[in-house]
Amino acid sequence: MSEMTPREIVHELNRHIIGQDKAKRSVAIALRNRWRRMQLEESLRVEVTPKNILMIGPTGVGKTEIARRLAKLANAPFIKVEATKFTEVGYVGKEVETIIRDLTDVAVKMTHQQAMEKVKFRAEEQAEERILDALLPPARDSWGQVEQKEDTSNTRQIFRKKLREGQLDDKEIEIDVAAPQMGVEIMAPPGMEEMTNQLQGMFQNLAGDTKKKRKLKIKDAMKALAEEEAAKLVNQEELKEAAIFNVENNGIVFIDEIDKICKRGESSGPDVSREGVQRDLLPLIEGSTVSTKHGMVKTDHILFVASGAFQVAKPSDLIPELQGRLPIRVELEALSSNDFKRILTEPKASLTEQYIALMKTEDVDIEFTEDGITRIAEAAWTVNETTENIGARRLHTVMERLMDEISYDAAEQSGAKFVIDAAYVQARLGDTIEDEDLSRFIL
């Protein structure tokens, strides 16, 4: 779990996302509150529930990007889902409880990787011994007991040194390794994923643990044996318990496109993929117990962050009970021409950096001038204003159109240099931007 302060979290988000300070502050505080809660005494910790967040803002302003970056910063079980993928319990489609099952799978995988990392050094030592045994089988007496001889020990040390220096990497040896589990792949009907997982687990258990002789290069054998030895050192039951504890106390669920499950107008009949899904989300967000293949998971202290553009629907169109369970509202602002200019240059691995690096692979140099970047930003903003406003995503469309000719001819123009200035942008995009009908279809 991340121990970063809210200021550090915002600073890290600023490296990738331009603007939206209110949203960054809200998620930073929510993330820090997870850590604060874990410092409390048990009796008080149980009473502190997370303050769930609803992010409201037009498309392409950074809602989903905040979620993606938060996942990397959180160092906690995190899952992002689309609200439109679910249907009400009892109908064909995914039930909302699969969110918690998937989150638990993420936590188990994450905890497993951490546990394997902790025992990595011991596992590599044991793998090294097994490889040395294969290279230098120990001498045995007439009773079958291993004999300890001085010269054998010295030879073993020489081989150990060579092994560590990588001199034996390409030598092939024959070793016993655990046979890969041949899992039976079963296509799950919608809503029956849990039953399918249980069936697959049953088929895998029938195979049991079998050893198989394989001829491998020493560097590949080292990797395979280290993984096998690490798996022996990890207690799977303790690992599952730790993963469930991590989900229950640090888990974060990001629900995107929540505005798409609002009820629109007066309609008769069951609304299984809209209001029905909202009703099913209520117990998850409020706190309930979900059965997973790893054990029972309580959702009382899982943090839920929902987001939506709310261009057609309004937050008040959500059912009142769900509105009450998302107490923190954050509005994200539409992006300006100046924001677009900053997006093109300031973030780590910005769009301009990406195109420069891509063309560099063909030995073509690209240089974006200040006035060229300003013109690109203005072009994207103008098209957004005159047609549909799709936010920063418009920059991808404009940049692709701008770089189209250079990208196509780059392989034949090795060593060339192109300067993308205002005049170049105007020449490539000017007519398209000024003609509203053209920009509607091309940009």
From Swiss-Prot:
<keyword id="KW-0963">Cytoplasm</keyword>
<dbReference type="GO" id="GO:0051603">
    <property type="term" value="P:proteolysis involved in protein catabolic process"/>
</dbReference>
<dbReference type="InterPro" id="IPR004491">
    <property type="entry name" value="HslU"/>
</dbReference>
<feature type="binding site">
    <location>
        <position position="321"/>
    </location>
    <ligand>
        <name>ATP</name>
    </ligand>
</feature>
<dbReference type="InterPro" id="IPR003593">
    <property type="entry name" value="AAA+_ATPase"/>
</dbReference>
<dbReference type="InterPro" id="IPR003959">
    <property type="entry name" value="ATPase_AAA_core"/>
</dbReference>
<protein>
    <recommendedName>
        <fullName>ATP-dependent protease ATPase subunit HslU</fullName>
    </recommendedName>
</protein>
<feature type="binding site">
    <location>
        <position position="256"/>
    </location>
    <ligand>
        <name>ATP</name>
    </ligand>
</feature>
<dbReference type="InterPro" id="IPR019489">
    <property type="entry name" value="Clp_ATPase_C"/>
</dbReference>
<feature type="binding site">
    <location>
        <begin position="60"/>
        <end position="65"/>
    </location>
    <ligand>
        <name>ATP</name>
    </ligand>
</feature>
<dbReference type="Pfam" id="PF00004">
    <property type="entry name" value="AAA"/>
</dbReference>
<dbReference type="GO" id="GO:0008233">
    <property type="term" value="F:peptidase activity"/>
</dbReference>
<keyword id="KW-0067">ATP-binding</keyword>
<feature type="binding site">
    <location>
        <position position="393"/>
    </location>
    <ligand>
        <name>ATP</name>
    </ligand>
</feature>
<dbReference type="GO" id="GO:0036402">
    <property type="term" value="F:proteasome-activating activity"/>
</dbReference>
<feature type="binding site">
    <location>
        <position position="18"/>
    </location>
    <ligand>
        <name>ATP</name>
    </ligand>
</feature>
<dbReference type="GO" id="GO:0009376">
    <property type="term" value="C:HslUV protease complex"/>
</dbReference>
<comment type="subunit">
    <text>A double ring-shaped homohexamer of HslV is capped on each side by a ring-shaped HslU homohexamer. The assembly of the HslU/HslV complex is dependent on binding of ATP.</text>
</comment>
<dbReference type="InterPro" id="IPR050052">
    <property type="entry name" value="ATP-dep_Clp_protease_ClpX"/>
</dbReference>
<dbReference type="GO" id="GO:0005524">
    <property type="term" value="F:ATP binding"/>
</dbReference>
<comment type="function">
    <text>ATPase subunit of a proteasome-like degradation complex; this subunit has chaperone activity. The binding of ATP and its subsequent hydrolysis by HslU are essential for unfolding of protein substrates subsequently hydrolyzed by HslV. HslU recognizes the N-terminal part of its protein substrates and unfolds these before they are guided to HslV for hydrolysis.</text>
</comment>
<keyword id="KW-0143">Chaperone</keyword>
<dbReference type="GO" id="GO:0016887">
    <property type="term" value="F:ATP hydrolysis activity"/>
</dbReference>
<dbReference type="InterPro" id="IPR027417">
    <property type="entry name" value="P-loop_NTPase"/>
</dbReference>
<dbReference type="GO" id="GO:0043335">
    <property type="term" value="P:protein unfolding"/>
</dbReference>
<dbReference type="Pfam" id="PF07724">
    <property type="entry name" value="AAA_2"/>
</dbReference>
<keyword id="KW-0547">Nucleotide-binding</keyword>
<comment type="similarity">
    <text>Belongs to the ClpX chaperone family. HslU subfamily.</text>
</comment>
